[in-house]
From Swiss-Prot:
Residues 344-464 are annotated as: Disordered. This is Rhodopsin. GO terms for biological process: phototransduction; visual perception. The keyword Cell membrane applies. It is a multi-pass membrane protein. It comes from Sepia officinalis.
Length: 464
């Protein structure tokens, strides 16, 4: 690409506002680029508004979806809906077909501010969703407060305040909102290398990008580790499960795989959507600025605009009750997107067997399945820890020791139809359960019980 200022200035000349000198050094942008970009942004805007609008409609209409955890999904859909409506179609689409921004400087600032606040809100809401899922899946047994509508509302208020804080600075002179790329849209000024702009970009990079991404990485990494460890432990304990528990274990294993896959997709989607913007901004401030061409600056815009499309797909369509609501209200979407009707029915069955209640945080059936399986597994582990291990002997007070749960043996303890042994004596025939030795000094199996020693008399002296 040439570095000399071209004679034909029509591509960057704008009578309504100033254009940064950096963009004037590049040659004419072909018309095909403008038209292709306009079509792409228009499609993203229409699909983003439609998809997120459906999400908002279904989550507000369907009572079973109105849980505290799903308030984050609604907030994400609202921010993406507004992001698509204002920052995509129609303003940028019209500008692309006209081949320049025609709405003036004031509209440029409003456009940049709305894009900033709702773009950052989308990022921060995703981090809140990851925190909620981590609390439900990664720490199901923790003695922490359950998610409530009030707590979710306060977290959403924090997201709005956080996003506004980092978006309003350029309005008051800490940075600026200017034209970027092929000069058909406005965003944060990352080209100017003065102290105000540089500090604004660095702070936004740390607090508005790195901070949320660290939260997302931490939460989903621990979710994947939790489901992986849970799968190994359930495999080791599978032989002790009855038919109903085994069914739940198999359902939980399927839920684990879904959750792990969704976690990987979420992190990948986040990086693909917002990392290009961060890279270009840092490159413009600290690297060879000539590398930031109109095309290099415009690519991050396309990735960011597209995030408003796949966010509802990842966060909403993966929700079993949401798919059920789609099937009831918009059956044509099921046909169009080729959702498996059997999968929708399976989701209904899963929700029936293991319901996700508001008291449990409103998690999906997959999360509820896993939570119940982990609770069952922990209960069995507690029983094992409380009961004397093989080779140890219970006290004289009977078998099992008073207050101890029965061992996790088939049929439980005592075996069905057998009365408990006399206090202080070893079990009769059929006792103890297979694999557990009798107390030390017990008479052989089948021998009649001996008389108990008088109170205060040593047992060995009494027998002698």
């Amino acid at each position: 690409m040439g570095r000399d200022i071209p004679d034909n200035e029509t591509w960057w000349y704008n009578p309504t506002m100033e254009v940064h000198p950096h963009w004037k050094q590049f040659n004419q942008v072909p018309d095909a680029v403008y038209y292709s970009l306009g079509i792409f942004i228009g499609i993203c805007g229409i699909i983003g508004c439609t998809g997120n609008g459906i999400v908002i409609y279904l989550f507000t209409k369907t009572k079973s979806l109105q849980t505290p955890a799903n308030m984050f999904i609604i907030n994400l859909a609202f921010s993406d809906f507004t992001f698509s409506l204002v920052n995509g179609f129609p303003l940028m689409t019209i500008s692309c077909f006209i081949k320049k921004w025609v709405f003036g400087m004031a509209a440029c600032k409003v456009y940049g501010f709305i894009g900033g606040i709702f773009g950052l809100m989308s990022i921060m809401t995703m981090s809140m969703i990851s925190i909620d899922r981590y609390n439900v899946i990664g720490r199901p047994m923790a003695a922490s407060k359950k998610m409530s509508h009030r707590r979710a509302f306060l977290m959403i208020i924090f997201v709005w305040m956080w996003s506004t804080l980092w978006s309003i600075g350029p309005i008051f002179g800490w940075g600026a909102y200017v034209l970027e790329g092929v000069l058909c849209n406005c965003s944060f000024d990352y080209i100017t290398r003065d102290s105000a702009t540089r500090s604004n970009i660095v702070c936004m990079y740390i607090f508005a990008f790195c901070f949320p991404i660290l939260i997302i990485f931490f939460c989903y990494f621990n979710i994947v580790m939790a489901v992986s460890n849970h799968e190994k432990e359930m495999a080791a304990m599978a032989k002790r499960l009855n038919a109903k528990e085994l069914r739940k274990a198999q359902a939980g294993a399927s839920a684990e795989m879904k959750l792990a896959k969704i976690s990987i997709v979420i992190v990948t989607q986040f990086l693909l959507s917002w990392s290009p913007y961060a890279v270009v901004a840092l490159l413009a401030q600290f690297g060879p600025i000539e590398w930031v061409t109109p095309y290099a600056a415009q690519l991050p815009v396309m990735f960011a605009k597209a995030s408003a499309i796949h966010n509802p797909l990842i966060y909403s369509v993966s929700h079993p009750k949401f798919r059920e609501a789609i099937a009831e209200n918009f059956p044509w979407i099921i046909t169009c997107c080729q959702f498996d009707e059997k999968e929708v029915e399976d989701d209904k069955d899963a929700e029936t067997e293991i319901p996700a209640t508001e008291q449990s945080g409103g998690e999906s059936a997959d999360a509820a399945q896993m939570k119940e399986m982990m609770a069952m597994m922990q209960k069995m582990q507690q029983q094992q820890a409380a009961y004397p291990p093989q080779g140890a002997y219970p006290p004289q007070g009977g078998y099992p020791p008073q207050g101890y749960p029965p061992p996790p043996a088939q049929g439980g303890y005592p075996p069905q139809g057998y009365p408990p042994p006399p206090q202080g004596y070893p079990p009769a025939q059929g006792y103890p359960p297979q694999g557990y030795p009798p107390p030390q000094g017990a008479p052989p199996q089948g021998a009649p019980p001996q008389a108990a020693p008088p109170q205060g008399v040593d047992n060995q002296a009494y027998q002698a």
